[in-house]
Structures are given as structure tokens and as C-alpha cells.
Amino acid sequence: MLRLLGEGGFSYVYLVQDTSDSALYALKKIRCPFGQESVSQALKEVEAYTLFAPHPNIIHSIDHAVQNDSSTKVSGIGNEASSASKTVYILLPYYRRGNLQDTINANLVNHTRFGERRLMQLMLGVCKALKAMHQYHVRNTPSRAAAKAVRDEAAGEDADAARRNARAQKRTMTADQTHQQDLNDEQEQPLMPDDEITRAQEGKKPGDARAYAHRDIKPGNIMLSDDGRTPILMDLGSLAPSPTPITSRSQAIAVQDIAAEHSTMPYRAPELFDVKTGSVIDTKVDIWSLGCTMYACLIGKSPFEARSDETGGSLSICVLGGDWRWPGEGNNANKGKAPSRSNTQSSVNGNVNSEQQASNERIYPHPAAREVVRRCLQVEPSERPDVDELMTLIDTCLSELPEDDEGHNPAAEL
């Protein structure tokens, strides 16, 4: 183990080296101190990696293991033995160039910016990853079966411990309390089952469609291959079946709570901030997040983070209202719609040389790039493009961008 690469919540990612051939890997360590729920969530990520492998734009796991921590116990009731805390280890490829957030940070430090052509080419790769998820077809693979077996075994152990604790608890309850607890146990159904990835494929035959949404697209979850040309989408712990119909208020609250935990706020779609009964959460959440990601690569932060900082208002209110701007646009701007080049230059320069400057200089980002972002950031999911339409929009954008507009990117030189 060489060094810590990153951390968040109960997970840590380390740079590790194979002693036999000196190969470098990323080792993700996920502490699971809360029994079945946290173990199942961690192994859900393991299973998600196997669904799409091999895909050039989606990270794959090399190996994984579940380890009991004999020194730590989950607190039980009475004198019943309780299950040991577990740690899930996931071995992943290591990418020395880091992720798009590293590129954004480098640009901010060095006062440079992302070349629009290079960004759009990378976004095409991300769209290919999303297409594999949004248009996934069921298949049977040995690796997925193995991941499910490990998940079922770990969940079974924790379920046994939970039953032991429940029996111990009942022994301390009165008859009336025990009867009420039995009724509660019978009525209680999981709103969002931990094995929802597996259950989503029940009744499906190999070849049948079964869409999934990533639900946490952001610059930090898009790695760059060692050649700097291929984006790799990572962190599949937030993966969820799509569409997800919201049929009750309790389910709406559950989905909203899960989004608050697993979907990064500045990149989270508005329908996940305020989940309504009768609505449907689908793959369009990823299109919104990808629009925020493109904006962040071009400007340095999420559009709603930027707007919230500018106005001092709530980020969530900005998201729900679709309130964002390109730098330099006034409050009457049409929700980030790209102005014409000449009009923008005239308003900025305000002198007789403005038209000449407009011919020699162009606005950044290019109007074609702005239009792609604007199409993604529609508050109504139905008004956003699907992944195929977005790929067409990006292709059109690339055809309009100057060939020499690569921009200076310090991350490309790492």
C-alpha cells in the first residue's frame, strides 16, 4: 500500500502495488459497520461493475473480498452474539491522469481552460458509457453470478444476526408489545431493496432490455485513461434500475433520501430534490448531471454552484428553478441560451472597435457548446435529450467548433 488517493464517508481509496510485477492498482476499502444494509450497499457496487464489463468507458473491478473484522462488533441486545463488522475491498484499475475534477482544479490554479473540442470528444465517450447503462440488455455472465453469490452469503449472515437480536429483544417485551412487533414485521416491506440490481432483472431473459441510471455523474467520477483520450465512468454504487415509478409518499421519501446520500448535490437533477408521488425517475437524471459536468469543465464549477455563489441563494432553489447563467450574462438571460457572437462582443466592449474584435475573438464557451449544455439543463425531464439525441447534438457541436480549438490543458501533460 503506497498512499491514500481519496476518501469519503465510510470508504477509502488507496494506491497499491503488486509485489510480483510492480503493477499499480486502486484499492477501495468500504467499512460496513451497520450490518446487512451497509454490506449489501457495498456489494451492490461490486455487482454493478460486473454488469457492464467489458466496456472501454466503464471501470471494471479486478477482484473483491469481504472480510470480517473480529475486533469490532455491531452492538446487539441482551447477551446474544451479534455479527462482526465487515469491510468490503474492491480492487480497481489505477489511472495516473486522475479524473476530470483534477483537470478542472489544475485549470483554476494555472489560469487555463478546457479546450471545447477535446471536452466534447470526451463527452462522446461518457455518452457511450451511459448508453450501455440506459440501453442495457440482460445477459448471464459467470462474474455476475459470483458477485451475487458473495452478496447473498454476506446478507444471509447479517440477516441471521438480525433475527437473533430480534429474538433477544422479544424476550424483554410484554405480550402486547410482542404481538405489535409481529404485526409490524409482517407489514414492513423494503421500499428500495438492497438487491434491486438483481431484482430488476427478475422475469427477464437474456437479451431483454433492462435500463439503469448511474445517478451520480460528476467530474470526479469520470477518470481519464493513461493516453488522455478515453473517459472512464466510475463509482457505480449509486446505480439504480430505470424507470422507477414513484407509487407512494413513503417511496418518494426513500428515493429522495437515497439521492441525498449518493447523488452529489451540485450535479443532482431537480426531480431528485423533490420526489413527487406519481412521478417517474428515469435515465434523464444522468443527462442533467452530464450537462452540469460539461459546464463545470468549461467554467470551473457546477452552473448552480456558480449561480448560488453569485446570488447568495440556496443551491437547491437554483436547481429547482433552473436558475443558471453563463459568465457575463445578465439576469434577463434566457436560462443560459447562447448569445450571438457579435451581440456578446458589442455588449462587452461597448466601443467602436467591438465589431472588429468580434471578428478576431470569439466568446468562450463557443455557442455550439453552450447549446449542448442548455439542452441538457431543462428542468422538465421530458424536454432533455436522451443519450442518442445527446450524442447527435455533440457530433453537431464538434462539426461547428474550430479545428484548432484544443485549448491548453495542463492535465494532458501529466
Regions picked out by a protein language model, each given a short descriptive name:
Residues 60-85:
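Short beta-strand micro-motifs within the conserved protein kinase catalytic domain, predominantly
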Residues 379-404:
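Terminal C-lobe "cap" of eukaryotic-type protein kinase domains
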Residues 2-8, 13:
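Protein kinase glycine-rich loop
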Residues 84-85, 302-381:
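C-terminal lobe of the eukaryotic/viral protein kinase catalytic domain
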